[in-house]
From Swiss-Prot:
This is Probable thiol:disulfide interchange protein DsbE-2. GO terms for biological process: cytochrome complex assembly. PANTHER family: THIOL:DISULFIDE INTERCHANGE PROTEIN DSBE (PTHR42852:SF6). It comes from the Bacteria. Coiled coil: none annotated.
Length: 188
């Protein structure tokens, strides 16, 4: 192989890292343009994935999808380490007076999670301990907080990524709830 040919080959490899870097930057830029609160879950319209996790409040007990409420409820993904989860907590306490909420404690130390609930109150009818993130992974959780609207049949109807506030509740969840109620009225 001639020296000229070897030099040309080396020049191609010099640009390869630059091309790879540009491709990664382009993908990152495209991804950052997406609003994570508006990204629909692939599980919308599908049942909650099968699971068997520890109950955070009664560690000797396992929780499965059969333990979920048999009515429309919220599944809230949270962690004691999550500042936004603490921000939404007062609204969850208020909301829990009118509808069931199941908590999915995500990638958390159980003692820290219990301490947070003892300090701020417990809005959850049931608290699933997902310290390894297994159920969250199957749900497609991006991070905490996330809230899912689940119908009485255990089907995921809506997903919201971010802190649940009265405004989000009114703008995002109430319309979904009303659609669900209209569907239920047709079935009756």
């Amino acid at each position: 192989m001639s020296m000229l040919h070897q030099q040309k080959r080396k020049n191609h490899f010099v640009f390869l890292p630059l091309v790879i870097l540009l491709a990664v930057c382009a993908l990152l830029f495209i991804g950052l343009q997406q609003d994570p609160q508006k990204i629909a879950s692939a599980l919308i319209g599908k049942p909650v994935p099968t699971f068997s996790q520890a109950d955070l409040l009664r560690t000797e007990r396992r929780v499965t999808q059969q333990d979920l409420p048999q009515q429309t409820f919220l599944l809230n993904v949270w962690g004691s380490w999550c500042a936004y989860c603490k921000k939404e907590h007062p609204f969850l306490m208020q909301l829990a007076k009118s509808m069931p909420i199941v908590g999915l404690n995500y990638r958390d130390n159980p003692q820290n999670a219990l301490a947070m609930l003892n300090q701020l109150g417990n809005p959850f009818q049931l608290v699933i301990n997902d310290s390894r993130g297994e159920l969250a992974l199957n749900l497609g959780v991006d991070g905490a907080p996330e809230t899912y609207l689940i119908d009485q049949y255990g089907v995921i109807r809506y997903r919201y990524s971010g802190p649940l506030t009265p405004e989000v509740w009114q703008e995002m969840f109430i319309p979904e709830w009303q659609k669900l109620e209209a569907e239920n009225a047709k079935v009756r």
